[in-house]
Swiss-Prot record:
Protein function: Catalyzes a syn cycloisomerization.
Species name: Pseudomonas putida
Quaternary structure and interacting proteins, as annotated: Homooctamer.
This enzyme's EC code(s): 5.5.1.1
Catalytic residue positions: 171 (proton acceptor), 329 (proton donor)
Species classification: Bacteria, Pseudomonadati, Pseudomonadota, Gammaproteobacteria, Pseudomonadales
Descriptive protein name: Muconate cycloisomerase 1
SMART domains: MR_MLE (SM00922)
Catalytic activity: (S)-muconolactone = cis,cis-muconate + H(+)
Homology family: Belongs to the mandelate racemase/muconate lactonizing enzyme family.
Keyword tags: Aromatic hydrocarbons catabolism, Isomerase, Manganese, Metal-binding
Top-level taxon of origin: Bacteria
Gene that encodes it: catB
């Protein structure tokens, strides 16, 4: 039997997609637009798979930028895979891991595209290729990131009214500590028991600030504190995890499956944020999830603010998890005002609903893609 081969891999920068609320303020970066990298894998049987590699703020968050992702795929990763069997994803990803250190965002996009193609070929959704889904929808949190307390409260109340979100994450850390704490506590008091409120500090506190802040936040009903201090301060993370009244979630601390094992062994976090881009793909992120489950660590489905393609690739992986205690934040497509697929993800009743159509369940809108593409 003749194998189906990878014929071509193309990386396309989808440049400056507008967002619904410029600015979107994070501790390390303020977003006005979002730039995606679309990956198209064409196979010898005529099937095309699509994937996405997206970063936050160029190089502000991680080690890869859109331009770097495209350059490395074009020059190194794609040539290594052309001519290989398209249906042997293990062999393809093993070759990439031997060829290139890191580059997890680029690898994740390629793996997602290979899974999409294989799902289309077999008539199965990607979740079935990953072992089978145990749920059909995912709770999705919304990030409040305007920096304005009254505006954030109004936005949260609107989301509750339309049954879009009932979990809210506040991006803090860039302002003085007292100002951030006042902002968060005011929002929680206004929303009360109608919503879960969480914070993401993106490593911006030192340990002395975090000791005080975690106590205040926990005492005021904040449900979760994400990455309060630097990922390199492992002993500080352990101490905070032991004394904080609110659970601590590791995000930036997990840049590989090996990081997840080390964090679990040290007892440095109560919750792991799962991100396919930082682990190297949907299959790799499931290895991190298995480490967490073995260690009794709760799980949360994170985002790199991907568009619809990256969001659905994450969603298909998260559907297969036995526990996803803290839900997800797969709201990336809702942040964008432009779409490059024909089937935008469906959000209703506080959930993202994932269809059972083959592959990721998406097709490209070629006309819209052409408006924003930069090859």
């Amino acid at each position: 039997m003749t194998s189906v081969l990878i014929e071509r891999i193309e990386a396309i920068i989808v440049h400056d997609l507008p967002t619904i609320r410029p600015p979107h303020k994070l501790a390390m970066h303020t977003m006005q637009t979002q730039t995606l990298v679309l990956i198209r894998v064409r196979c010898s049987d005529g099937v095309e798979g699509i994937g996405e590699a997206t970063t936050i703020g160029g190089l502000a968050y991680g080690y890869e930028s859109p331009e770097g992702i495209k350059a490395n795929i074009d020059a190194h990763l794609a040539p290594a895979l052309v001519g290989l069997p398209a249906d042997n994803i293990n062999a393809a990803m093993l070759k990439l891991d031997k060829l290139a250190k890191g580059n997890t965002f680029a690898k994740s996009g390629i793996e997602s595209a290979l899974l999409d193609a294989q799902g289309k070929r077999l008539g199965l959704p990607v979740s079935e290729l990953l072992g089978g889904r145990v749920r059909d929808s995912l709770e999705v949190a919304w990030t409040l990131a305007s920096g304005d307390t009254a505006r954030d409260i109004a936005e949260a109340q609107h989301m509750l009214e339309i049954r879009r979100h009932r979990v809210f994450k506040l991006k803090i850390g860039a302002n003085p500590l007292a100002q951030d704490l006042k902002h968060v506590v005011a929002i929680k008091r206004e929303l009360g028991d109608s919503a879960s409120v969480r914070v993401d500090v993106n490593q911006y506190w030192d340990e002395s600030q975090a000791i005080r802040a975690c106590q205040v936040l926990g005492d005021n009903g904040i449900d979760l504190i994400e990455q309060p201090i630097s990922r390199i301060n492992r002993s500080g993370q352990v101490r905070l995890n032991q004394r904080s009244p609110a659970p601590i979630m590791a995000d930036e601390s997990i840049e590989s499956v090996e990081d997840a094992f080390s964090l679990a062994a040290d007892g440095a976090a109560s919750i792991f944020a799962l991100k396919i881009a930082k682990n190297g793909g949907p299959r790799a992120v499931l290895r991190t999830a298995q480490i967490a489950e073995a260690a009794g660590i709760a799980l949360y489905g994170g985002t790199m603010l991907e568009g619809s393609i990256g969001t659905l690739a994450s969603a298909h992986a998260f559907l297969t998890l036995r526990q996803l205690t803290w839900g997800t934040e797969l709201f990336g497509p809702l942040l964008l005002t432009e779409e490059i697929v024909n089937e935008p993800p469906q959000y209703r009743d506080f959930q993202l609903h994932i269809p059972r159509t083959p592959g990721l369940g998406l097709t490209l809108d070629e006309q819209r893609l052409a408006r924003f593409a930069r090859r």
